[in-house]
A protein has these predicted regions:
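Short S/T/G/P-rich N-terminal loop/turn motif that feeds into the first structured element of a domain
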Residues: 1-72, 83-107
Length: 107
């Protein structure tokens, strides 16, 4: 069964731009679709006060491989630079979970 991966980032200082997300997506080059990725979504949930990323993967191992091999090498230097800048709105997710899906459909 497919695996869901959810990340939620608290909206920082009222900033609802997608500058950080867009820069990371450009650097990761998602035109080269990661092996095992079935769907990727990202957007604001203003009621919850978060920017939410929701992915569905064939297996957790495929998702973790993408995160470790392609995503983290891009995020780690950005996070290190942001930690030195008190005005930065870059923050790690305040919620991050994996869970097995009972069912999924595409239309």
């Amino acid at each position: 069964m497919a695996i869901a991966y959810l990340q939620e980032f608290e909206i920082q200082n009222g900033d609802t731009s997608t500058t950080n997300y867009d820069a990371i997506v450009t650097a990761v080059n998602l035109e080269d679709v990661p092996d095992g990725l079935l769907i990727h979504t990202a957007g604001f949930d203003h009621d919850a006060g978060v920017f939410r990323i929701f992915d569905v993967w064939e297996t957790r191992e495929q998702g973790e491989k993408f995160i470790n091999d392609r995503l983290n090498p891009i995020i780690e230097p950005i996070a290190a630079a942001a930690a030195q800048n008190p005005d930065s709105n870059f923050a790690p997710p305040n919620r991050e979970i994996w869970y097995e899906l009972h069912d999924s459909m595409t239309g």
